[in-house]
Curated annotation (Swiss-Prot):
Gene: CYC
Function: Electron carrier protein. The oxidized form of the cytochrome c heme group can accept an electron from the heme group of the cytochrome c1 subunit of cytochrome reductase. Cytochrome c then transfers this electron to the cytochrome oxidase complex, the final protein carrier in the mitochondrial electron-transport chain.
Lineage: Eukaryota, Metazoa, Chordata, Craniata, Vertebrata
Organism: Gallus gallus
Alphabetized UniProt keyword annotations: Acetylation, Electron transport, Heme, Iron, Metal-binding, Mitochondrion, Respiratory chain, Transport
Domain of life of the native organism: Eukaryota
Residues the record lists as binding heme c: C15, C18, H19, M81
GO molecular function: electron transfer activity; heme binding; metal ion binding
Family membership noted in the UniProt record: Belongs to the cytochrome c family.
Name of protein: Cytochrome c
Amino acid sequence: MGDIEKGKKIFVQKCSQCHTVEKGGKHKTGPNLHGLFGRKTGQAEGFSYTDANKNKGITWGEDTLMEYLENPKKYIPGTKMIFAGIKKKSERVDLIAYLKDATSK
C-alpha cells in the first residue's frame, strides 16, 4: 500500500493544476476526481470528455490507474490529458493511495 502523505505531495505537484478531489469540487482543465474509484472512464458529471475517454469503457481502480498514470496517451489514445505520466512505480502507488483516500471523503 502506498503512502498517502507522499501521494498528496505528488498530487499537489503534478495533478492539482488541472484536477480537484473534494466532493462538489469544480472541474478545471481536467475533471473533479471525487468518486473516481469504481467509475467508468469519461463519466464525471458536467465535464466534456473526448470520445476516446468516453469509449474506453474501463472502470477506474488501482490496477487501471497504475497503468494509465504511467503513460496516459498510450492507455487512452486520443485523451486530451496533457501529462507525460509518472514512470516511477512507487510514486504511482503513493498517488493512488492518496486518490483512493481523498476522492472518497
